Amino acid sequence: CKEDSKEVRIQRAKMLMAAVLLAQGIPFIHSGQEFARSKHGLPNTYEESDEINKLDYMRRNQYQEIVNITKDLIRIRKEHAVLRYCMKEDVEQHVSFADIAQKVLMYKIRDEHDDMVIIFNPTGEHFSYEFEEAYPLIYYNGASEDILIKKVNIEPYSTIIFSRNDFLKPEGTVF
């Protein structure tokens, strides 16, 4: 990743933060991750000085966008119980996966109150996906939206969240 531009590294950091906060289970955010903590390119800083391992709180202002996205994703996680299943059986029953071009991860979480689709594009490529019917878009790379989308353009290093609260599609409906 060192050869990537700073912009690409920031996009990846935002997407990876989303992956942590939108995964089932208890999310673990390493100290300073929300403001792109750096250890100056050193691979293992366990025995390094406090100068290397300290939290540089000035980065919070520099990376405010990641801080804000972290807050938004925590809010979304709190608002949607389907993102907080505790039991393996619940995950197996309510979560299904699909892929787009074998590069983009898309998963659906559905119960009697929520019908949610989450898309992660970890590549530098653009993709598109068309749903059978329009879905309410609630989050696109840090922007909170509230519009219906049938066809979505999936930007590089992006996170996209769709949700229909209090809605259940009939059993047997295709993903």
Language model feature labels by segment:
Residues 6-10, 21-29, 33-175:
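Carbohydrate-interacting/catalytic domains
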Residues 12-17:
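Short, acidic/polar
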Residues 1-5:
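Active-site clefts of carbohydrate-active enzymes
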